[in-house]
A protein has these predicted regions:
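Bacterial N-terminal signal peptides that target proteins for export
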Residues: 1-7
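Bacterial N-terminal signal peptides
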Residues: 7-16
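Expand to "…catalyze enediolate/carbanion chemistry for C-C bond making/breaking, isomerization
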Residues: 18, 22-321
């Protein structure tokens, strides 16, 4: 199911290059969102997506409600583990919305201080993932994704027990009754509708959760193919900062051709794992190389507004931004 959905998205990207190039501003009054999660809607249509960072509470959320980005990466790995602030941030996004594309909010993906280092660690801390989802966030990025069994526990934490399709290798989900109230209000749907949509995409084609991994150290790198293959995962990155620390090499946020050969090899290995498992690859994009990155296979751009604007024009995006 996952491989089919993402393969179709890649075909869609090639087709967009043949479509007429209409300006985003001309469409903004007529475009009708097809999904809750703007980032998933774009990926499913074969379009790369671009993000910005976020933190704080209500006022910060309201300020970012009109962001240029497709999604906001809300920092909790090294920032405060403050679920009240996160809930207020989401409320601010709603009050400041909708987006230019007509979505109620930009998508919000939260990085966790919980790590994918072992099944036991993830199982003991699955409640952190659940508290994030209770805020109305649209996804989670799990750092140091070393152990496939930990990744399975991560996905379980983001599913209801009766979620479809069933995946025997995952086991049943861990979300419980009562978790649908606040997020359904943030999403602007009923609690019953939320429970149907609160599931990872593309495992569930109708799911609105976007789950990702940071394959960002030598231990995770050794298992890159295995962790990327876990059903329910939609994207991964190679974590050039932490990867450099793990390999005792310089930081890898520079252009690919400037990196140490061992860092280039690590990046290539994560990119290959993403392609093999039909999930999106996240990488830094710059105005001077965003088109090259897209051609290489990057589907999530970490960079500024200028790079995003150029990338959207390059792929002839139809959704307003």
């Amino acid at each position: 199911m996952k491989k089919f959905a993402f393969a179709a998205a890649l075909v869609a990207l090639s087709l967009t290059g043949c479509s007429a190039d209409r300006s985003a501003s001309a469409q903004s009054s007529t475009y009708k969102p097809k999904r809750i999660n703007k980032a998933i809607e774009l990926l499913a249509d074969g379009q790369p997506i671009y993000y910005t960072g976020g933190s704080g509470g209500y006022e910060q959320g309201k300020k970012l409600s009109q962001t240029w980005a497709d999604y906001i990466n809300y920092e909790m790995e090294h920032g405060s583990l403050d679920f009240t602030a996160l809930r207020e941030f989401m409320r601010g996004l709603v009050d400041g919305g909708p987006t230019k594309s007509g979505h109620r909010t930009p998508a919000v993906i939260v990085t966790l201080p919980v790590l994918g280092i072992s099944k036991e660690h993830m199982h003991a801390n699955f409640w952190v993932a659940q508290q994030v989802l209770l805020s109305g966030a649209h996804g989670i990025l799990l750092c140091h994704a070393r152990d496939p069994e930990a990744i399975k526990e991560f996905v379980r934490a983001c599913r209801y027990p009766n979620a479809k399709p069933e995946v025997p290798t995952l086991g049943e989900g861990l979300l419980g009754n009562g978790s649908q109230g606040n997020p359904s209000r943030i999403w602007g749907i009923t609690p019953a509708e939320y429970m149907k949509k609160a599931d990872p995409w593309p495992l569930n084609p109708d799911g609105e959760f976007l789950l990702g991994l940071k394959i960002e150290d030598k231990h995770a790198l050794a298992n890159a193919d295995k962790v990327a293959a876990v059903p329910g995962i939609a994207f991964a990155e190679w974590g050039p900062g932490d990867m450099g620390i793990s390999l005792n090499l310089p930081d890898g946020h520079g252009a690919n051709e400037t990196l140490h050969p061992q860092m280039r090899e690590a990046r290539a290995r994560v990119l290959a794992a993403c392609k093999k498992n039909k999930i999106a690859f996240l990488n830094t994009t710059r105005p001077e190389d965003v088109d090259k990155m897209i051609d290489e296979g990057v589907r999530i751009g970490a960079g500024g507004q200028e790079a995003a604007e150029k990338g959207r024009r390059y792929t002839k995006r139809q959704m307003p931004w």
